[in-house]
UniProtKB/Swiss-Prot annotation:
Protein name per UniProt: tRNA dimethylallyltransferase 2
EC category name: transferase
One annotated GO biological process: tRNA modification
EC number: 2.5.1.75
Length: 302
């Protein structure tokens, strides 16, 4: 398997599609929000990017759950392995592509985490704490949790709930075997990354980001569920429900995405410290040069 990872706005999808076309294979998404139907602009699905040379590259684990659903690592592992086995059975090496570091690390290492039940006592104790306080509490549990996507109090409380359960119920099951993968990271300097994020955010607003969230609210999805998803869905929902003005919404969201990208890179550097070999490629290289660099590594590892 080939794994393509990197922070938001670095061009992961473009590279994965180019490789999949060249290798005649399929992609598995590792994005914790692209699994939801109807959440398109804010998650950057860019489905047109999967068209190349008159061919649509299949991408698994996109649009598999309704918006408003709660998805987790436990569910992702099962869905990933179904897609992974299906692709292997058809004689292809899958390409895993995304920015949710915990999903990527879990499937590569073969972590098996249980479906964690709610803990009302813990939730009551954590209610009223700020996101900063909750993030510090979560950090004390160590590396095995996806802190990159925790940008609302509700998500942070759920993350602590899972971490607390795992601490008290150690899981060493090998239900999911480790996967050997060539890991490619797209490296983008900070200033360029920040500019891309800001430019993309402006583009998403012009493409109908606010209308997308309004449509989700009008369809009956509770505001608190959209806030739970964080980033665009959190901030635009706050704007549409009158809890902030447009300027504050935009600047707050822009800052949150910059912080999110920084947390993603922190996670990937942590993966390297935990023993993963990541081959970093300049995200500013032309697509064909990126593809050639990966093909050389793929051939050397084959």
């Amino acid at each position: 398997m080939i794994t393509i990872l990197g922070p938001t706005a670095c061009g992961k999808t473009r590279l994965a599609v180019s490789l999949a076309y060249r290798l005649e294979t399929e992609i598995i998404s590792a994005d914790s929000r692209q699994i939801y139907r109807g959440m398109d602009i804010g998650t950057g699905k860019d489905l047109a990017d999967y068209q190349v040379g008159g061919t649509t590259i299949p991408c698994h684990l996109i649009d598999i759950r309704p918006a408003g659903d709660k998805y987790n690592l436990f569910a992702y592992q099962h869905d990933f392995h179904q897609a992974y086995a299906s692709i292997l059975a058809r004689g292809m090496d899958p390409i895993l592509c995304g920015g949710t570091g915990m999903y990527i690390e879990a499937v590569l290492k073969g972590y098996h985490l249980p479906d964690v039940p709610p803990n009302p006592t813990l939730r009551d104790r954590l209610q009223g704490k700020s996101l900063t306080e909750l993030t510090l509490i979560l950090a004390a549990y160590g590396p095995l949790h996806n802190k990159t996507d925790v940008d609302s109090a509700q998500r942070a409380i759920r993350a602590i709930e899972i971490a607390e359960y795992i601490k008290n119920n150690p899981v060493e099951s090998t239900e999911f075997p480790p996967i050997d993968s060539l890991i490619i990271g797209l490296d983008l300097d900070r200033d360029t990354r920040r500019k891309r994020i800001t430019d993309r955010l402006h583009a998403r607003m012009h493409e109908g980001m606010i209308e997308e969230v309004k449509g989700l609210l009008d369809s009956g999805i509770p505001a608190e569920d959209l806030i739970y998803y964080g980033l665009e869905y959190k901030f635009v929902t706050l704007y549409l429900t009158g809890q902030t003005d447009y300027e504050s919404m935009f600047t707050g969201l822009e800052t949150a995405i910059h912080q999110f990208a920084k947390r993603q890179m922190t996670w990937f550097r942590g993966m390297e410290r935990r023993g993963f070999l990541i081959h970093w490629i300049d995200a500013l290289l032309p697509a064909d040069e990126q593809c050639e660099a990966v093909m050389k590594l793929y051939g050397a590892n084959g």
